[in-house]
């Protein structure tokens, strides 16, 4: 194998590198230099070709587009250089997997034809730190220090040995191997009822065959909620997939969750309803962890648990699934021996069509050939190395391919015969068994096996039989992989062609690996030799389970806490500072919360944009007209305003919430189970629903695998079943075995008819009253945050279990109060107790509060008790009515305070003030942990809007002759929000996948196409390299570039690019920002934070802008969602000034009001420096935006709607899409056609 080496590319020093080298600076303990260290990057490329000379200049150009090369960089004798990166003889990193997948789609890499597409096998990058040692000579201890700080075992990085020659002949890399079969998860197997299936050996487990009923779903429970859902599929040149049109069908919404010890999303394949393929999924996440004792910035963010958190968030971002909710649980120090391991929770809220598309495999259908396909690459993933995890990009592409394929075969049930889901272990042999369902077998072809596996095999002969079987087990069957196996047969259609098309459009690797057979077990056939083909046979899958571990003893201390000795003010501040209670902006602001356009409620609410929401909302179907009308006004009218409306239609949604019980569960499984379910349901209590029976609870359980695990699991499920039956709600289960203590997460979903009626936690008015409603009268301090901060977590009495009767009654009362508009805000009582609940309501609403401790109550116990309940805000005019109503219903309640206009937090008892402090003090405490994770930022203030027009929209449906193309960039999910915004404006959207560079079919039709949108982002783990590689891929897409150039040249066609990757494509084609004298292009560069940003930004539309989409919005200041890693436009300063002077700046990041001016500080401008948020061409036809109006095209997508007079009833961003259609009406077919506007930037000399 040939190795190409590229080095000395400029790089910015990273925080952990700055920390590691700080000791080398002057006056440091290991001082050697008075200069700041510098860093460079390099790349090592493995090429499986004897002659790859054409690759060197192409790869060099690609890497230089990411960062400039330093050609004259020379090392002096006093320079200490230390390189670190992945071990070249070890596991392939996720970065390499993703980048190689992109590179293989570059036509420039395959000049000799498609057969050379697999020339590049691996691309790894490393970093080098250069230190000029002018004070002292470097010693070995300096190298050892850098190695200790930068080569942490959990990252998989090591002291990098740089090849001395650019071209080295090396042996073929050794494939990963697993000598013995991986152990299966016994709890997962039991909760799925898999012990009743043939082939599952009970001799390795404490569970006995037949003794464990299938309790995955209780017989009286339902799995899902049925609602209408809408979806889009891309246009395809085959007749198997539709023309990218909008479809509405009856669908199912369901939830599913599980725990893992490391960052992983593969459980998304193991849906609770795995026979329904998900059309769309959103993710809930949770982390249970310990943190190091030091809490300063670099030691905190560089710790293993926080690195795992960041890896998990990056994995989620790359999968194109929005993150809608989560929890963060810090393990108390006195329980560190019980919960030593990090636990990561993944929950999925998914939509599916109501079609049984997967039939169980059985022997009868095998009369027709049923083929096995592998979706995704055969890559092993390593739980111990964060750099070698599974690929989020690949997981997302598999899910997208399945959704596209489902739409093409939905009318042909039985097409999918089996799928590798619901697995006790993700080994290849287990996946094949799951597809076969233990009633048939699989025949695999040697020609379809991975090359690294085939390289290990000897010719199939009796003498080699034992060795070959050993190799196949060790290098194939026993390995944990992140791919998906699917069995398909043709049912009156060419299903295989449909799968191929769907995978191409989704950017998902696939190949045929074999077929199903009548013979049980697995056969491997060597079809590379002449017939008769030799065969190796393997027994069917028989999972083995780990040995039982010893239970960890839990000690309950008999000592008491003297609460009267504690200082109330200090105790409250410590509770708010606790990471389990405090602000989660360090997570929420750096995850993709909105990518699909279906998210109606994230965790961010209120004018202060704080993450305190109890629930999230997804909209399965956008409220737009899809039925074709006989006479569409867009066909014959030039003035469409008479058909416009000034209020958005109500939209139904699915509300989801989670409840978590880890600390309390260690002491009492039954109480912990009920507490998790109670919290999840109370988090939904502010959602108006019609019937409590519509709620579906999904309980995710993780227990240590000890001697009594079977009893414990049955206890948890029986407790949940009894409690849910009493509430009349449905309940489903999943279970996992993990090290350490138990954890239980309840995910609840319910449908609501109008998402705008849902109540948020932020206080709305001054002088309103706060009511506390509780499910029980006793204090709940055992295991509370108040006791955790004292390191006396398990002291006192374990709280009693919540009464389902009382909980149900309280929920019914709250629903009545919400529907008669007596409640204006509400928040559940959980971690941190009542004081944390009231503080979050005050902080998110920007209101002061006065809290009254009832006479005779202990103030600290009253305020810190975590008794399940809800605090509601009631205006003064409704106070007596609510009070009387609660009395009449025998609800436990107290009036515990009121809101005030003064920004103070006051606590009093019997007219004595116990605490009276500025609200800012409590906000600082609540934000302290988040600020420690990302310091040096200015927190946003409430935004003020200014709208230059009355927002309206025209709901008459799309005109089928006014087409707008929406290009779906590689490995991105379908932009439902954008498609519906375009359709709502009267256009007919046409979704086009451009993943295939070899595709030559043109999609532009000059008679019907009025414009095009490009939207998407890089889903490669390293954003810089990934984005440049994807741009190179799209530049080489012949048909796409041909259509793009044609449409850009048409004076009556508009274009809109949303996101950095899309903007780069317009810049590359010289549509915006090109300067001919200097031959410079505009470009997008990475945020100053070096992170993914998701911000609710204030956007100003300049009066001078020429953008046709913003003509009605000139001089408007409107908030909008902004997401991405590259949110900064770059051009030489004179060019940016010239663009602004010429009206080519279309939008700007602004402060909280017009008087604040353009934003200059992070995060008001998410990039940290530049205020420009959008640019346009000189004639205004072409628009490049870093913010995304399609994600806030409806008011229900806004985290907070500012109070206006009159109230805002239509999103102003609808005007943008309406203006585009109005412009098209005026220019399409105009005679003479629109004249070209000269671009002052083209000839500008600076």
UniProtKB/Swiss-Prot annotation:
GO terms for biological process: intracellular transport of virus; purine nucleotide biosynthetic process. The keyword Transcription regulation does not apply. Gene3D superfamilies: 3.40.50.880, PurM-like C-terminal domain. It comes from the Viruses. GO terms for cellular component: host cell; viral tegument. The keyword Manganese does not apply. Keywords: Virion, Virion tegument. It is found in: Virion tegument. GO terms for molecular function: phosphoribosylformylglycinamidine synthase activity. InterPro entries: Class_I_gatase-like, Herpes_virus_tegument, PurM-like_C_dom, PurM-like_C_sf, PurM-like_N_sf, Tegument_herpes_virus_N. Disulfide bonds: none annotated. Pfam families: AIRS_C (PF02769), GATase_5 (PF13507), Tegument_dsDNA (PF12818). NCBIfam families: tegu_FGAM_synt (TIGR01739). This is Probable membrane antigen 3.
